[in-house]
Every structure is written in structure tokens, then in C-alpha cells.
Amino acid sequence: ETGAAEEAARRIAKLPSLSLVGLHSHIGSQIFDSSGFEVAAGRIVALAQRLHEEQGIDIAELNLGGGMGIAYVDSDDPINVADMAAQIGRIVSRACSDAGIDEPTLAFEPGRAIVGPAGITLYEVGTIKPVELDSGVFRTYVSVDDGMSDNIRTALYGAEYSVRLASRSSSAPPMLCRVVGKHCESGDVVVRDAWLPEDLAPGDLLAVA
């Protein structure tokens, strides 16, 4: 802790046009373990206690932010947001009681956890090209009609996604390929390793989630 939050609170307390009503934290993104939120809850209640005791400021709301992860691939194991919120609520209630301060409203920002599982991106297949690698093996590149301009996460973070042929069914054997975008950039990768039917053709639609 740097003390920056307490300094900001002191400045707000001196301004008659402002009222400090809440504290906010953000611990990260695509989180699959609730322990970080539990630590943040304890620290933010401790800060609320200091503000109450040292400056007479009563905090009405604690916002622990978002970052709850969702399942992009089968190995991802998301937090149950409702269960986590109930657990954090108990932690905050107990911590406030121990600190001798009123229990504030507890808020979260589970944006991706709510809307992410409902969203699918559709791409149209363009060029399909086997490319020989240095080892003498071939990798099939499947280009699509967009890429890093609508989703930069693969290039920046190495994010992984699931991809399926969406416009038709196919009984063709699967082939290992790399789905790439349309931009003039070597890092424009949509899905790094994807198993798609060998009869994949330009004009097919791929669903990425």
C-alpha cells in the first residue's frame, strides 16, 4: 500500500463540493480463484476503518471491481459469481463488525462474466494455405475477414479460444490449423491451434468463443 488512496481521501475531505461515498479496487482480469478478492476485501475494509478513525469519513460503498473469468476453452474453470459474492459478503460483514464500522453496500462489476458466455464472433474464411515450416512439416493457415482489430487479446496476452465450423456440418477428418486475421501483421492470430475439417473452404463461417 502506497498511501495514495488515503491521501486522496484527505484531499476530498477538504473540498466542500465533494463527498467521499465509496472505495473501489481492481485486482486483475480473467480470474479463476476467489482468494484475490478475499484479500482485497480485507484490505479495503481496513482502509475504510482508518478513514473512519482518523478522518471521520464513513464509507457507504465498497466496490471490488470485476475480473471474474469465463471459459474460453474447456480447461478454463470459472468462479461461480453468486457463490463468490456471498462469501465476500460474509468476509466484509465480519471484518466491519471487528473494525467497529457500519457495514457498507458491497458492489462488483461482473461484466464479462454476464455477457461473455452469451457472445460468439463469426468470421468468414478467406484463403486457406499450407505453409512448410523449417522442420519440413506443414502448417495450414486459415485466414478470416477480421482479426486483431476486433480482438487483440490473442496477440497481446496469448489468449486461447474455441473455434467451430458454424455454417454447415462436415464429416471430413480434422486438420490442425492456425486461424489468422487479415491485417499486415505477423502477430494477427485469432486461434493459434485449431482442429477444423479438412474440407474447410473459402466462404465457410467459423464461430469463435
Task: List where the protein language model places each region.
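A broadly tuned preference for mixed-charge, low-complexity surface segments
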Residues: 18-34, 72-80, 162-165, 171, ...
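Active-site-proximal beta-alpha core segment in soluble small-molecule metabolic enzymes
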Residues: 1-61, 70, 91, 96, ...
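Short glycine/threonine-rich loop-to-helix capping motif typified by GTGT followed
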Residues: 33-40, 71-84, 115-127, 193-196
